[in-house]
Design a protein with these regions (language model features):
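Conserved N-terminal alpha-helix of the aminotransferase class I/II PLP-enzyme fold
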Residues: 32-79, 86, 100-101, 109
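A glycine-/small-polar-enriched, mobile loop at the entrance of the PLP active site in fold-type I
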Residues: 3-54
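PLP-dependent enzyme catalytic core of the Aspartate aminotransferase-like
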Residues: 4, 330-362
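Conserved PLP-anchoring active-site segment centered on the Schiff-base-forming lysine
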Residues: 88-102
């Protein structure tokens, strides 16, 4: 088989340099004669690792000093519950902006804990697009406003930050965290599962403004209580140390290659190259409006489910893995997160051209 490129939506590709580093010291971390998986999470060396990981992340993402960084577990789904348990206060309700599957799922979970209002901000006509993002006239009625800036299933991304006035803005950035620089100060909470751009599954990143910590409802489990986790250095329980270690290597690698300035340019080039080919093709079609096309998850169809299935099977056989679209929409999806090189996109386009030449209806 030729070189394999992994287009999985998550768990996703990890930088080869990171995997090689981990492989090289897997059984002898820091010349201790043991693996990082075997050392105490409260030992000197691991405590130094997590301190450096946070320092590197803060530098790469330009996180202000009045924000706390937590490394938790439970994935984004865990945060779907943790957010309302920690942030619902005197107003007693929150606003959820529905742009697709994951934002709707977050709202559904939050309803177990609070009164939730939901506004659909996506139009699914001939093209899928995001509607108006100005909620400053109503946001002060809510304890927070929640949205998902990148919907992996539909391939829809929201590039502008919603206007919520002085209200607390919460963002599920699981699929576009660290893909470009953002102004952290516009958000009250940012959370993300690790398995797309941060590292392997098992770690959940939470970036939260200091003043939002300490208001959890009394029945909040300690594992979901942000104040408890802050005071315990994100280690109220034994954390997934190997996943944390790999995330630390990713943060360090991002610094070494030039940070998010470089990553932003790389990601824009990858996405534009692929979308330009799709738009020029007579076989493939993307149904998302250009201004809302995801940089991370590129969806496309042939219009024939049988041909889509053939595409997935044949692409897999030549080392282009995990291109099958989500079961909700079908078709194909190329997830091109930070670790995907431009060469992977070029290899995909080369296959797409060959497949089109062989299968375009005459």
């Amino acid at each position: 088989m030729s070189q394999v490129f992994n287009f999985s939506a998550g768990p996703a590709m990890i930088f080869p340099e990171v995997l090689q580093k981990a492989q090289g010291e897997l059984t002898n971390w820091l010349n201790q004669g043991v693996s990082v998986m075997e050392v105490s999470h409260r030992g000197k060396y691991f405590m130094e690792l997590i301190a450096q990981a946070e320092k590197d992340l803060r530098e790469v993402y330009n996180i202000p000093d009045n924000y706390r960084v937590l490394f938790l577990q439970g994935g984004a789904r865990g945060q779907f519950a943790a957010i309302p348990m920690n942030l619902i206060g005197k107003k007693g309700r929150a606003l959820y902006l529905n742009s697709g599957h994951w934002s709707a799922t977050a709202a559904k979970e939050a309803r177990n804990f609070a009164e939730i209002d939901e506004i659909t901000i996506v139009e699914n006509g001939e093209q899928t697009r995001i509607t108006d993002l100005d909620f400053s006239h109503i946001a002060d009625q809510y304890d927070y406003v929640h949205y998902c800036p990148n919907e992996t299933i539909s391939g829809v991304e929201i590039f502008d930050v919603p206007n919520v006035g002085d209200a607390v803005l919460v963002a599920d950035m699981s699929s576009n965290i660290l893909s470009r620089q953002i102004d952290i100060s516009k958000f009250g909470v940012i959370y993300a599962g690790a398995q797309k751009n941060l590292g392997p599954a098992g770690i959940t990143l939470v970036i939260i403004r200091d003043d939002l910590i300490g208001n959890a409802r009394k029945e909040t489990p300690s594992i979901w209580n942000y104040a408890t986790q802050r005071d315990a250095d994100s280690m109220i329980n034994t954390p997934p140390t190997f996943a944390w270690y790999l995330c630390s290597l990713v943060f360090k690698h991002l610094k070494e290659i030039g940070g998010l300035e470089v990553i932003t340019k790389r990601n824009a080039l990858k996405a534009q190259t692929l979308y330009d080919y799709i738009d020029s093709s007579k076989l493939y079609r993307n149904v998302v409006a250009k201004e809302n096309r995801s940089t991370m998850n590129v969806t496309f169809i042939t219009g024939n489910p049988e041909l889509d299935a053939k595409f997935v099977a044949e692409s897999t056989s030549v080392g282009l893995q995990a291109l099958k679209g989500h079961k909700v929409l079908g078709g194909m999806r190329a997830s091109i997160y930070n670790a995907m090189p431009q060469e992977g996109v070029e290899a995909l386009i080369s296959f797409m051209k060959k497949f089109e030449a062989e299968n375009l209806p005459q």
